[in-house]
Amino acid sequence: MQVSGIKNNISFKSAQLNIVSTADNHGDILSMPQMMKAIQMNKRDLFEKASEKSTLNLFAIAGDFFMNPSKKGFLTNPEFSNGDIQYNFLTKMVYTAKTAAGIKNRFDAVYTPGNHCFDGGDEWLFKKFERAPISTILTNIDRTHSPLADTLIRENSNIGTYKVYDIPDSKNPDKINKVMVLGVTIPSMNYYNPGLLKKTKFYDNSNKNDAYLEERDLRKTVRVVRYNVSKFKEKNPDGVVIVMAHTGNKISGLLAEKIPEINLIINGHDHKEFEVLKGSTLILSHGQGNKFMRGIQIKFDDKGKLSEIRARKYETEKYEPIARKDARLQEFVNVNIKADLVPLVYFKDNSGKAEELVLDDSIRYSNNILANYITSAIKRSVRLKYPEIDAVGIPSTIFRNGLKSNEKRSTFNNIDLMKMFDGVSENLSQVRIGRINGAELFELVLENVQNNLKSRTRNALIQWSDIQINRSLVKEINKGNSAASYKDAIKIRDKATRKFAPIDPNKDYTILMSDKYLLKDSENIKIPAMIRDKFEVIPESYDSL
């Protein structure tokens, strides 16, 4: 358990705010019970002095609780989508936190959306939260160009651009301590979810990956946060400002730098696990997949000034076996996904290595056995309808979850299978078929590899069914350490001979690719835009194939 925080030299505390915070849960319902159990078993520390009138208790989610909400495929409740089941687990988690704080004590749950929360579009998300037991905060939304959100904000008290809480002093009933909570969503929706936000626009919306966003790209975002903070501080100079930022640490750091009146930023999006003090602003990041949560205590002194911010990190994995033994919790799990937990896939050890699948001539390169296996399976499936296909390309980010055997797990269930393509929303898993010449195909593959070498985590490598890439050789050529040419590092399987050979620049090839990759416009991705018109949408998705 890690402890971090800010403390002023004042000992007496007259009001307190307890926060349990999380982010980037990514719809991982299998690990949510362990977080619920962690909340239950640490409730006295998490919700310190919860019953006092001078204490407020919050449960905060800094984005991406959901992922691919429109996807279906459950066995227990086939009529339900991912989002329906994830929402059930959300309400259960909120109720767990509320009961841990004390059912009669002051409590609220606050949430700001992340990019994955919009995987099913804006209408799906806002319809769910219109009557949800949680306050949704949308500080950087452009209400003028967001008719759906604007209407909901005007008509629903639980949806707004900020929320202010009153915490009474423990001794002086006339003194009220103020806390404002804001929520900032990563604005690059044209990058993460192009075309899915029909009636919603965030300030500074762009098609840039957040790694490439600079201060000049976020001026309106900073301005709207500063405006709200300034108005609050004018009336409440001693008030505390908290920002739930699903932006990543780079942008959270920018907000802290430009708006030093912010006391605490609950950061999500970049899946980091660190705490950093930027000026007088404490930034707490939250990892992903329910691996840990944070317990935060904010205390006011006798004069109503901020006295202390203390944060602890609670790992949740050790509570997994305890959660499985909780009859009530397991009853809830079974109602939602019992049939989906039955083992469907088994790893068989044929080579002395439990994680290694039996290889055949469909496997090209040992960089990702699972990706190679799946791209080949998709290729075989699509060739039943489109026999002219030469190769299938899938960005590796789509394989957000793999099937990895270890000493703890060698069997996998329907939930595991459904999550294999969780790196892209159902709407954007559409595929396109195009016929391009060899020179264009070679440049497409090489550009992707070069961008991946610049940043492996930001620029996804495309996994191919019948194209062999020697990424290491490309790297050595770049350094001048090899006399080979790039053509030696990129080869395609010849349909007739089944052998790999250099891509022929004078030959045409038929390729199946991700709709999302072809639509993506980025400063570091050029070729897809040049060949996009040669691709046609087909009525298939990666899941259906």
Enumerate the language-model features and the residues they cover.
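Classical Sec-dependent N-terminal signal peptides that target proteins to the secretory pathway
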Residues: 1-5
